[in-house]
């Protein structure tokens, strides 16, 4: 069964592929279905955390994608190695503190002098701040979804519709 992947999912898979290729080049460890085991897991973890200086959440995202590919490959009979199913082959993550801009910081951004090309980007950024939307949802704002007293938008990340009141 074929499913359509979102742009961000494709991007994450491509980033994982590129990271694996860089890992091979940097360490000499050849990545294949047969070589993905707990030794790979530990070396890849050290590479992500120490060599690339990325977070544990980035490592967790890469492992989640690798496990997803291995599950599919096992399901269709291409992969026979089941090391990735062991307890130690975990998708790690840690809670992050949400970061946000204060009202004063948003106001400062609004009054900062910028050249014309950055000025438009800033205006879009501020609009999205005031609407409480992600920057990726900007293309979804059209005349068709702006009503008398609200804006209805199908959000890209969650694929759910939100209705934003206009005051």
Please tell me what each predicted stretch does.
Residues 87, 131, 140-167:
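Conserved tyrosine-mediated DNA breakage-rejoining catalytic core shared by Y-recombinases
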Residues 38, 111, 140:
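Phosphate-coordinating loops and pocket residues in cytosolic domains that bind phosphorylated ligands
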Residues 56, 60, 75, 79-135, ...:
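Basic, Lys/Arg- and aromatic-enriched nucleic-acid-binding interface segment
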């Amino acid at each position: 069964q074929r499913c359509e992947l979102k742009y961000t999912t494709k991007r994450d898979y491509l980033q994982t592929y590129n990271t694996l290729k860089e890992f091979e080049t940097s360490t000499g460890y050849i990545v294949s279905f047969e070589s993905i085991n707990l030794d790979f897991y530990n070396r890849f973890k050290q590479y992500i955390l120490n060599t690339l200086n990325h977070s544990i959440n980035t490592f967790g995202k890469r492992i989640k994608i690798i496990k997803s590919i291995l599950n599919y490959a096992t399901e269709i009979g291409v992969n026979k190695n089941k090391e990735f199913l062991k307890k130690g082959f975990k998708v790690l993550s840690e809670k992050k503190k949400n970061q946000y801009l204060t009202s004063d910081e948003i106001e400062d951004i609004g009054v900062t002098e910028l050249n014309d090309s950055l000025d438009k980007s800033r205006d879009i950024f501020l609009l999205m701040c005031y609407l409480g939307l992600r920057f990726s949802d900007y293309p979804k704002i059209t005349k068709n979804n702006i009503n008398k007293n609200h804006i209805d938008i199908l959000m890209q990340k969650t694929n759910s519709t939100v209705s934003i009141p206009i005051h």
